[in-house]
Amino acid sequence: MSLDSLFEYILLTEQQASEMNRHLREVKAEIHRCQEEARNLSGRLEEAKVILETKVHLLAEKKCERLLLKKHHDVLECQKEDLLKEKEELTTILAGIKKQMAEEEEKFMKEVMEFNSNYGLTSKRDVLLREQAKAEMERLEMEAEALMNEMESLKHESFHLNTLQVQKKTINNKLAQLQNTLKDIEDKISEAIETTERLEAEKILVSQKPQSDAECLRLKKELELYSNEDFEAVYEALRMEIEFLQMKISQQSGKQ
């Protein structure tokens, strides 16, 4: 083989080395970009974790509050049922008392009128009895008013129960939003891990290429051939060139 051919091989080797260096620089830039992206994602992940932990803590508090509200709601429901039953019983009793009172009053007034008519008593006795009957009626009316106030209190408790139902719905919506946010973060982490593993594998492949590249192996065989044919000067020049190229590639790989 002539010296021109050897120089062409050397130029070709330099071109290939330049191409490999360019490819290594591209891989290095891509790895650096992915590392920056991974660091950014890690920072965002830490922030998201802090936010998530805060929201989880709040959610746990809301869950406890929800359980307490549910228990309170159940107690109020039981109390409501008891009060409704008591209200029905008191309403029935009140109606019976009013009816009995009206009957007793009518009977009493009839007896008083008959007694006064028979014995000619003064009107003062009649007035006294009427005042007593009036006082009894006022007492019963006050009891009826107390029952009505109790019924109004039950209505307010029913409104409070509706408010608790609205709070329960709001808590469930917040829980669903937190679960969706957590899923998005996990997907981004998985994507960053896959990209990093792929670039690491490509880096290893590029760093091992000089030992497995077919062109480099062919040049080594030609050098051995020239050595055997006593072309010592050419052999030494090519050997130094190849060692120089391998050293540059090794340095590039070491920097990576």
Curated annotation (Swiss-Prot):
Subcellular location: Cytoplasm
InterPro entries xref list: CCDC172
Alphabetical UniProt keywords: Coiled coil, Cytoplasm
Chief location category: cytoplasm
A GO CC term attached to the entry: sperm midpiece
Transferase listed as a keyword: no
Coiled coil: 10-255
Family: Belongs to the CCDC172 family.
Protein name per Swiss-Prot or TrEMBL: Coiled-coil domain-containing protein 172
Species the sequence originates in: Xenopus laevis (African clawed frog)
Annotated gene: ccdc172
